[in-house]
Swiss-Prot record:
Domain of life: Eukaryota
Species: Gibberella zeae (strain ATCC MYA-4620 / CBS 123657 / FGSC 9075 / NRRL 31084 / PH-1)
Protein name: Peptidyl-prolyl cis-trans isomerase PIN4
Keywords from the named record: Isomerase, Rotamase
Family under the similarity heading: Belongs to the PpiC/parvulin rotamase family. PIN4 subfamily.
EC number: 5.2.1.8
Length: 133
């Protein structure tokens, strides 16, 4: 029984490990190939602030549970009237730094946003993604 258990564990381990290794390798080696499976375009919102202090105020509001689109209307220096909505964006259409973090971000809603910060030549961004396709 010990041999059978070991063989079963090895087979299971190889299959699981092989799959994990393959997926990790695909993601690392092919870069955009791994990400392309997830999404070619994203429905993205952002809050753009030129000043670090203003970005920190916006983050505090988000962390206090205020809806993303409401914070965008109050703090964003871009697309404020649309609640920060940039709409559907394809790969290659955004600032490279912005795009890298935006395409890696989980989708969420404005009521309960999952967001990330990034600094680009435009200023400080707080980004959330509403959908991907």
């Amino acid at each position: 029984m010990g041999k059978n258990d070991k063989k079963g564990a090895d087979k299971g381990g190889k299959a699981k490990g092989g799959d994990k290794g393959k997926d990790a390798k695909d993601t690392k080696d092919s870069g955009s190939g791994g990400k392309a499976k997830g999404a070619q375009s994203i429905n993205v919102r952002h809050i753009l602030c030129e000043k670090h202090a203003k970005k920190e105020e916006a983050l505090a509001k988000l962390n206090d549970g205020v809806k993303f689109d409401e914070v965008a209307r109050e703090y964003s220096e871009d697309k404020a009237r649309q609640g920060g909505s940039l709409g559907w964006k394809t790969k290659g259409s955004l600032d490279p730094k912005f795009e890298e973090v935006a395409f890696a971000l989980e989708t969420s809603t404005t009521n309960s946003p999952k967001f990330v910060e990034v600094k680009t030549g435009f200023g400080y961004h707080i980004i959330m993604v509403e959908g991907r396709k």
